[in-house]
């Protein structure tokens, strides 16, 4: 670690910031009045040879209280689970399911009133192929493994999952000539399967309304779509069916660490005494790691907005596609001047598993970990940019939009590991995009480490299959009629837009997750 070089780079941005080696990490301290400069300092501190960037620069005048449940009781006081999982997003629920394979008492706590209330419900549901990643990244390892797991996982959990593919479309002749062999070489090096070149005529066969400028593109057959929140809920329900426990409205506000172990976790529902802790806390994962004395990273929230179009516009995309970013955006498609734009795959136009067209997302570095606000400026910029990929896009097609915050680290990689300074914590942190893809594979590694460290035995009665009522609107009339004959409440439609029946709502309320 060349600390002098890092100090020069950081102080060029902000001379008042202190740079030091803190337990093998690059630690930044001080106070600035501009969030963009804080972000830039963190990026400048990234280097090989350090465990990570611990960016403790304060934003002058800014303080954010985490959203906490109002509930306070002693329901969990004195409990001694073998494993405590902090966070009920897709990673936490996938970990709970994997650990329910073992003869262990597993407890998951989530501060919201349901699972999948953070980034796990505020994303597009893409199962990514991994072509945008780099050799040596944890992201690449877990995305490749997780992508391959989804076919069987969806079958076991009764999830809708389609490999509708992704396309990366070229708008210029030079891209169409130069990029394909390089793209194919990268796919081979990374181990991404199902990548091939498609010409202009094949693009027209794949997409009913392709952009007129399309010269050719790269087709990635392994990409797919799921419902991210339905996947999270199914993972959680299956974990509960196999013996795991879930406590919602439960907020972790401190830990006691003795020697090199967490011995007590303080919550609004009492003190818990676990043998092991798994940190799956999303945008708060660095806060949890800090409580446990194991922090080597910093989460800098990266906000993104997605737009949902009316289902009648399904002809806009039958797969997921975007304009190649190698050629610069035309002036008319460039976003209006705004705050620092963060690292992003660039967004695109895609068909969701529920049949709507989704457009976006964008990316902005923000200080707030739970900033879910939307703005007309962001909506306008997304439409302006993505009209290049799909010229038929129109603001009048929008039915709603939403924002979420990604749990990005300055290294732009996951932090999936055993504890370094605290031996009974397991980190599953920095899980931003493509976290939905990676979650099942991350959970397998966490399970294997805990199985080894706690000397846990496998259950003989673990059931990987979760059976639930299928989405009736997706069934053929004769299949739907069979369900209605058994239970007339399946024929009583409550939501006419999405054709959701009273019976399906009751089934959801009576599912294992309460």
Label every model-predicted segment.
Residues 1-88, 92-93, 97, 127-129:
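N-terminal targeting leaders
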Residues 134, 139-144, 172-179, 218-237, ...:
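Short beta-strand to alpha-helix junction loop
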Residues 53, 96, 104-106, 194-195, ...:
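Hydrophobic anchor at the start of a short beta-strand
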Residues 218-276, 280, 284:
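Helical element adjacent to the flavin cofactor pocket in flavoenzyme catalytic cores
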């Amino acid at each position: 670690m060349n600390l002098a070089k890092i100090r020069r780079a950081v102080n060029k941005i902000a001379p008042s910031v202190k740079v030091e080696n803190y337990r093998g990490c690059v630690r930044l301290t001080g106070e600035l009045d501009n969030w963009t400069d804080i972000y830039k300092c963190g990026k400048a501190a990234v280097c090989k040879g350090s465990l990570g960037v611990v960016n403790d620069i304060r934003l002058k005048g800014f303080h954010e209280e985490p959203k906490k449940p109002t509930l306070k009781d002693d329901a969990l006081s004195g409990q001694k689970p073998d494993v405590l999982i902090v966070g009920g997003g897709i990673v936490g629920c996938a970990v709970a399911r994997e650990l329910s394979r073992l003869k262990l008492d597993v407890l998951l706590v989530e501060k919201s009133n349901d699972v999948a209330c953070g980034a796990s419900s505020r994303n597009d549901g893409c199962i990514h192929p991994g072509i945008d990643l780099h050799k040596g990244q944890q992201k690449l390892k877990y995305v490749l493994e997780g992508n391959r797991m989804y076919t069987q996982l969806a079958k076991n959990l009764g999830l809708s999952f389609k490999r509708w593919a992704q396309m990366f479309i070229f708008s210029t002749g030079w891209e169409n000539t130069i990029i394909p062999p390089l793209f194919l070489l990268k796919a081979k090096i990374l181990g991404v399967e199902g990548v091939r070149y498609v010409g202009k005529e094949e693009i027209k066969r794949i997409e009913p309304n392709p952009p007129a400028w399309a010269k050719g593109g790269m087709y990635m057959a392994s990409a797919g779509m799921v419902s991210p929140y339905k996947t999270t809920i199914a993972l959680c329900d299956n974990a509960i069916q196999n013996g795991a426990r879930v406590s919602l409205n439960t907020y972790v506000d401190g830990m006691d660490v003795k020697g090199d172990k967490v011995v007590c976790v303080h919550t609004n529902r009492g003190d818990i005494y676990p043998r092991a802790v798994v940190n799956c806390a999303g945008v708060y994962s660095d806060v949890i790691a800090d409580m446990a004395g194991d922090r080597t990273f910093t989460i800098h929230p990266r906000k993104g907005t997605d737009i949902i179009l009316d289902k009648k516009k399904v002809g806009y995309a039958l797969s997921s596609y975007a304009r190649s970013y190698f050629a610069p955006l035309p002036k008319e498609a460039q976003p209006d001047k705004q705050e620092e734009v963060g690292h992003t795959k660039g967004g695109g136009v895609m068909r969701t598993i529920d049949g709507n067209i989704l457009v976006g997302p964008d990316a902005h570095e923000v200080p707030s970990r739970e900033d879910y606000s939307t703005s007309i400026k962001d909506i306008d910029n997304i439409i302006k940019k993505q009209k290049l990929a799909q010229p038929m896009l129109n603001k009048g097609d929008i039915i709603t939009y939403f924002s979420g915050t990604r749990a990005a680290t300055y290294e732009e990689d996951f932090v999936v590991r055993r504890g370094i300074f605290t031996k009974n914590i397991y980190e599953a942190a920095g899980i931003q995009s493509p976290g939905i893809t990676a979650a099942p594979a991350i959970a397998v590694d966490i399970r294997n480490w805990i199985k080894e460290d706690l000397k846990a035995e496998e259950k003989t009665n673990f059931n990987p299959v979760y059976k639930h009522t299928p989405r009736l609107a997706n069934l053929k009339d004769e299949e739907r009629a069979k369900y209605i004959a058994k239970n007339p409440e399946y024929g009583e439609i409550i939501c006419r837009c999405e054709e959701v029946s009273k019976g399906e709502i009751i089934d959801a309320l009576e599912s294992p997750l309460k």
